[in-house]
């Protein structure tokens, strides 16, 4: 049986995401070409999956983008830890009653975060990521709410 994650789990996952992703942005050096390329590859894969309406793949590639954000910390231990966080998020996404509704809005915002980082605007990238994580958490909690009453 697949473990179902509840609202408290989601809040905890987003606490971890905020800690790692916002720290990665604030502590980052200017993006190196290979770092930008990895992020852009994840964004392009997300775009292709969205065009195919393969929402599970959209979620997977979007999370790969966020793994590359955490990768800016240059810590194999954080990378490994965040891989586990991503796996748990995938479980949550899969249990959301309408994964397409959840996944649809994020690509443009991921791209904006990349572009701000590429331009060296860490404060704006951090603000955009913070708002992104707040909105993502709230939407995910809303999507999970109907199923939590059963």
Model-derived features with residue positions:
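Conserved amphipathic alpha-helical segments that form helical-bundle/coiled-coil interaction surfaces
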Residues: 8, 13, 34-94, 106-115, ...
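Residue-level signal for the nucleotide or nucleotide-sugar donor/cofactor binding architecture
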Residues: 120
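Short linear motifs at protein or domain termini
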Residues: 1-30, 137-150
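Active-site loop of classical SDR/Rossmann-like NAD(P)-dependent oxidoreductases
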Residues: 102-104
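Secondary-structure edge/capping motif, primarily at the C-terminal ends of alpha-helices
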Residues: 27-28, 46-53, 96, 117, ...
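Membrane-interface catalytic loops of GT-C/OST-like multi-pass glycosylation enzymes that act
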Residues: 99
């Amino acid at each position: 049986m697949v473990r179902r994650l509840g609202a408290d789990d989601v809040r905890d996952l987003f606490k971890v995401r905020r800690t790692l992703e916002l720290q990665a942005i604030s502590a980052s050096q200017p993006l190196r070409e290979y770092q930008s390329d990895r992020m852009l590859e994840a964004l392009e894969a997300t775009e292709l999956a969205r065009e195919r309406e393969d929402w599970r793949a959209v979620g997977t590639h979007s999370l790969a983008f966020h793994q590359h954000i955490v990768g800016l910390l240059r810590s194999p231990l954080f990378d490994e830890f965040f891989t586990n966080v991503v796996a748990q998020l995938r479980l949550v996404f899969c249990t959301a009653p309408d994964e397409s509704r959840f996944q649809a809005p994020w690509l443009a915002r991921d791209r904006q975060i990349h572009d701000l980082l590429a331009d060296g605007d860490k404060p704006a990238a951090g603000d955009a990521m913070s708002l992104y994580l707040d909105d993502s958490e709230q939407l995910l909690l809303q999507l999970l709410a109907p199923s939590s009453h059963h």
